[in-house]
Design a protein with these regions (language model features):
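N-terminal membrane-targeting/pre-transmembrane regions
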Residues: 1-41, 132-135, 139-168, 172-194
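Juxtamembrane boundary at the C-terminal end of a transmembrane helix
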Residues: 289-299
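Non-transmembrane, membrane-adjacent beta-strand/coil modules in membrane-associated proteins
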Residues: 1-5, 81-150, 239-240
Length: 299
């Protein structure tokens, strides 16, 4: 089987530069949160930091695919390798290969906007869906057309790839190969398609962000002393400094992280009901802390 590598230098460099830039922005947001008087602006800095960290993690997670990408050919199949992913395309199903420059008219493509980042999905009026596994621009890409799926690839030695493809295509297959897609175990985890889990985690996170926003937004105008405890008659029997408004935030953050981790742990053990219970309880806990801040900060 002949293997044709991609040129991963540009996407890898672009990814590293992007990660450094994003982390620099996150660090600047952290400094802004530290040196700005506590207010809703502080919450915005925190939110920006979290979003930038999530973006950096996403970019880093894509780099192995660009670094470890190649296309292998024999008389029976074309194997597209992208990180731990394998797309095995039977040679018998390939109808033809064309230059990607022939498809520029009407092509729509969703990809991450970094140089050399051509992993994504597109659509063309004549061919339908296109699956991009490329590290170079359209001028260097090759489209592999089959009845069901179309692949866009960019071997570094495009001419050598086409010569090898044509030679093997003319020889015809020696055995029947079925299309298959081999994914790393984590990519086939049921969690990624579990909308109920996504819904619960999203609501737990939003409830916690609401808790932080409420505390930081109320702090500047809160009195110097705020009620911390009420007796059975509803009368305040203990006061404390207004910095105590952040106690529910701290406890809520710890419980949020523990709840997410515990839920993922039991979910991985195929106990989805228990994971739902943990995450649903997490939503209720965060809502309870919101009520707590309202009671002590607005009393």
């Amino acid at each position: 089987m002949s293997v044709f590598e991609t040129d991963s230098r540009l996407p890898f460099t672009a990814g590293i530069v992007a990660i450094v830039a994003v982390l620099g922005g996150a660090a600047a947001a952290v400094l802004g949160a530290i040196f700005t008087p506590v207010s809703l602006i502080t919450f915005l800095y925190i939110l920006i930091t979290l979003l930038l960290l999530a973006l950096a993690i996403y970019i880093a997670s894509q780099l192995p695919g660009y670094l470890h990408s190649s296309y292998a050919l024999d008389r029976n199949a074309l194997v597209i390798r992208w990180g731990g992913l394998r797309e095995i395309v039977p040679m018998a199903e390939i109808q033809r290969v064309i230059a990607a420059t022939d498809l520029t008219d009407g092509l729509r493509l969703r990809r991450f906007p970094l140089p050399g980042w051509w992993r994504g999905q597109g659509r063309h009026p004549a061919l339908g869906k296109l699956f991009f596994y490329a590290t170079d621009g359209l001028q260097s890409q090759i489209v592999v057309i089959t009845p069901d799926r179309n692949y866009v690839i960019s071997p570094y030695d495009a001419e050598g790839f086409l010569d090898a493809f044509n030679a093997r295509y003319d020889m015809r297959p020696t055995q029947q190969v079925l299309y298959s897609r081999v994914e790393p175990r984590y990519m086939s985890w049921q969690f990624w398609s579990d909308h109920a889990a996504h819904f619960l985690l999203l609501f737990m996170l939003l409830a916690h962000l609401g808790l932080v926003a409420l505390a930081t937004g109320r702090y500047p105008s809160a009195p110097a002393q705020i009620p911390l405890h009420f007796d059975a008659a509803g009368i305040v029997d203990r006061m404390g400094p207004r910095t105590q408004i952040f106690a529910p935030v701290f406890v809520g953050t710890v419980l949020l992280l523990l709840g997410i981790a515990a839920g993922i742990f039991v979910y991985a053990r195929r106990e989805r009901g228990m994971a739902y219970l943990l995450w649903g309880g997490g939503v209720a806990v965060q809502a309870m802390f919101v009520v707590t801040i309202v009671m002590i900060a607005f009393a």
